[in-house]
Design a protein with these regions (language model features):
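Small cysteine-rich, disulfide-bonded extracellular modules of the LU/uPAR three-finger superfamily
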Residues: 1-84, 92-121
């Protein structure tokens, strides 16, 4: 399965409201992990198909002027012996602003696993 990323309609609406000066744009603070992917995510989604864990980001890097990378590392204990095939970036209000589905990633119980999620224009 090829990786597919979708910006949610809710995420788009928040950007538009911030640009219009109606509300402030809440920062992305967490990454969600799941194993229920069954195709490309829909822009109307605000939940993973089967969310397993939501975790604070480990870091944020500016890759270029129009690309930020969000990083989250799972410890050995987190989601041990679990398959992961859907991810999301979550803002501080708890909303999913971007969802990505991907091929199965098997998380063993003897290793950390780091996920990177690029947000680019």
């Amino acid at each position: 399965m090829a990786s597919t990323t979708t910006i949610t309609k809710l995420g788009k609406n928040k950007v538009l409201k911030a640009r219009a000066g109606i509300t402030a744009l809440p920062p992305i603070t967490q990454m969600a992990f799941g194993n229920g992917a069954n195709g490309a995510p829909l822009e109307d989604d605000n939940a993973l198909k089967n969310e397993l864990l939501r975790k604070d980001l480990s870091g944020i890097e500016q890759v270029t002027e129009t690309n930020f990378r969000y990083i989250c590392t799972l410890t050995k204990e987190e989601l041990a012996d679990t398959t992961i095939n859907e991810l999301a970036l979550c803002d501080e209000e708890g909303d999913l602003v971007m969802i990505r589905t991907c091929s199965d990633k098997n998380k063993d119980d003897d290793e950390e696993m780091t996920f990177e999620f690029d947000d680019k224009f």
